[in-house]
Structure formats: C-alpha cells, structure tokens
Amino acid sequence: MKKKSSRLNLISIIMAAVSLLAVVLRSFYVYYTPSWMRQHDVIGFGAGDGQAAFIEYFHQGHLLIDFDPREKWGFFQPPLHHMLSALWIRLQEVLGFAYEAACENVQILTLIYSFITLYFSYLIFRHFRLEKTAMVTAFAISAVHPGFILMAGSINNDMLAVMFSVMTIYYALKWNEDPRWSYTIALALTIGLGMMAKLSAALVAPAVALIFVVKWIHAGTDGFVDHMKKFVVFSVICAPLGLWSPLRNMIRFGVPVGFTPEVGEPVSAPLWQRIFDIRTAKPFVCLEKYGDPYNEFNIFLGMIKTSLFGDQDFAIAMEEAGHGGLGAGMMTAFGWILFISASLLAILCFIATVRVLCSGRFIAKRSERAFMAAIYGISVAVYIRFMLVSGSYSSMDFRYVLYLIPVEALMAGIWMKGRNDRLIPAMGILTLAFTVSATAVYLMLSMAG
C-alpha cells in the first residue's frame, strides 16, 4: 500500500513538473518573440495588411467590414479573434498602456488560449481514465509539443480555433455520456465560436452530428422528441455564430464560402515523391529562400517539421543573430533529436490510433469510438487532400489540424493502459527525449529573438 502511494505521489510530482514546464516554455517564448516574428498571415501592426491590420481595423471603431475582404490580405477570415484582440488593446489603453505595448500584448490572449487548450486536453485524458505512465505520456506530449509553443505566440486566429476544437471534443464526449442541456449549449457555443474564429473549426462538427444521430437512433419516442428539442436549440445557437460572417461576405461581396487565397511556395514534385520520398538533409523545413535546392514537398516530412519548427530554419536564425558555429550546431543537434523522437512518436501514435479505434477492447462505448474515429479520420482526410490538391508548401502546415495532437496523445495513452511489455519503456524514453529536446530548442531560440 505504501509503495502504491509513493508511486502515485511520484506521478503527481511529474504531472506538476510537466505543467510548470508547459507554462514556462510557452510564456518565455511569448516573452522573447515579437508580435511580427514567426507569424502566419499577420505581417505586422501598422502595415495596413494582414491579420494585424484586421485587428487594427476593429480597434479603430469599425463594426463590420464595409468592403470586399479580398482587397486586403487576411481580412477574409472570420473576425472573432480580431474583435477580441481589438477590445483587449482598447482595455490596455484605458489602463494606461501605450498603443505599441498593447499591440505586443495581444500575445497574452493567444498564450491564454494555449493554456485553456492544455487544460481541456487533460480533461479529455481524465474522461478516458488515463492514469500513471499513460497519463504522464499523453499529457507530456500535449504540454511540450512545439506546435502549441509556436501558436502561443502567434497572434493570428489559429490558436483560438484550436482551443474551441479541443473544447468541442471534450463537451461532445460529456454530452454522449449525459445529454443534458448545459452540454448541448456548450457544444453549440464551442462549434459556433470556433467557426467564428476560423471556418476550419467546422471539421469537428460532422463527428458531433454522428453522436447526435446515434442518440436519436437509440432513443425511444419520448427520448427522440427531447433530443430533437436539443438539436433545434443547438442549431439556433451554433449556425448563426458560425456562419454569419462567411454568408455576409458571400451575399454582400460575392466571396465564396470557405474562400482561401492562393499562397505559398510552389511544390512541383510528382505525387510519388510527395508521399514516399522521405529523404531530408536537415531537421528544419527545406525552402529555397533558405538556400535549399527545393521547397519541402513530402507531406509527411512537411507535417512533422511544421509542427515542430513552423516554417523556420532555427539554425539559420541562430547564425543571423550572431550565434553561428557552436550555437547553430547545438540547435541543429537538438533539432535532429526533436525531429527523430517526434517522428517515432508519431508512428507509434498512429499505430495506437488504428489499434484503439478498430478494437472494442480499448474503448468500450461504440459511440465514443465512432466519434473519435470520425474526428481523426475526417480531419486527416481533409488535411491530406488539402496538401495534395493545393500544390504549395504552405498547405502542409500542421497548425491547421493542431487539435489532433491531444487526440493522438490520447490514443497512445489508451493503448498503454494496462500493458507491461516493452512498449511502456519505449514510449517513456521517446517522450523524455521529445520533452528534453523541445525544451532545449525553444530555450536556445531565445538567443535568436
């Protein structure tokens, strides 16, 4: 009994340490990263274009766009994040902050979004009763994953959309367990507000619709009527929140729903290379602008590298900051450890996902298994199709489906539950290598600014 208690205390200490590490890494990254650096579609405050300009548009007192949003870069996005950011800037000004400082502090919002995402990831792990090593592994992968570190400092709308997507997964699981009104309204709000942040948040909606249908099928006459009432209320809340912006742009300015401008470095490699050619000379993304002979073209290398380093070459960043030689060499060395450990973890997590979702031995409730399979299958299918159809490097950026990180971590944790074979130490070693190398990379990156 005493030995079991000591082990539980050790697990609690490790969980607390990982939580603290997540807070430190994300907060420190925001501290040393300016609001214009390592961003996506932001450009910068005062530039007149990009998502920073979209924030400024609302800060200037405008309520809604009164021109074709395609005329300014980044203005085609749904406006929730930009409205919240404008209000946050205004509040800081009331409190005495200078405008420039208030703009920099928009990163505080995205940092908070990343913390909320981690908290709801933990709740999802708790829902599936992960514990001990399985919980530590799943939580550590989600807590220190560089994708969330990067998004914590990114002032575009991605982190808010990811936050609502993870919240949707949690509330859908709770609704499936107990379809009470509070969970129904929470689901409507998280999907609707997620789409108001970024339309791609709708990728989780079909899986939610699936569990709604399953409930209707298994409900009696009285239960069917009750579920129908909830669905009507859900639709009345969710649809206007999620669709008013794209529908308004379509009706007023002729902007197609789901409009995305052509952007990004072109990829000219044939299909077989994009799928099977996984040779790489460095852990960071290969781009012609960094002096590489080609733009990253393999979809699997693209998704791993962008999830870890964004579209940056951190070794070059170290050199440009005057830390070439040893500094760039150490960054590359830890970059390789991070890349290799992340790749091996991704393979094991994929195997775990297939095993868990294809067998009732791991998740007893068929509806939960179907829901998680729909979340994963639809998201991956849309993401891969987007990469292959787009023909540009930018389409491979993993930030579009970053909410799949806790999903994959969950699958690994479920797979690990109750096992005592070689999988446990293997996952432990890989997770430790992943954690240490991610920490080293993002601490060293502070030297490059």
Could you describe each region identified by the protein language model?
Residues N9-G48, S235-I251, V380, A433-A440:
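Transmembrane signal-anchor helices characteristic of membrane glycosylation enzymes that use polyprenol
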Residues F28-Q39, G44-F76, L80, W88-E93, ...:
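Extracytosolic helix-loop segments that constitute the early lumenal/periplasmic catalytic or substrate-binding loops
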Residues F97-A101, S121-V144, M163:
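Transmembrane-helix signature of polytopic, membrane-embedded enzymes
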Residues E104-R129, M167:
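Transmembrane-helix motifs of polytopic, lipid-linked glycan transferases
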Residues H127-R129, T168-Y183, G194, W216-H218:
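Membrane-interface transmembrane helices that cradle and orient dolichyl/undecaprenyl
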Residues G147-L160:
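Short acidic/glycine- and proline-prone juxtamembrane loop motifs at membrane-interface regions
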Residues Y171-K174, V204-V236:
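Perimembrane helix-loop-helix junctions
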Residues K229-L345:
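Membrane-lumen/periplasm interface segments of specific transmembrane helices
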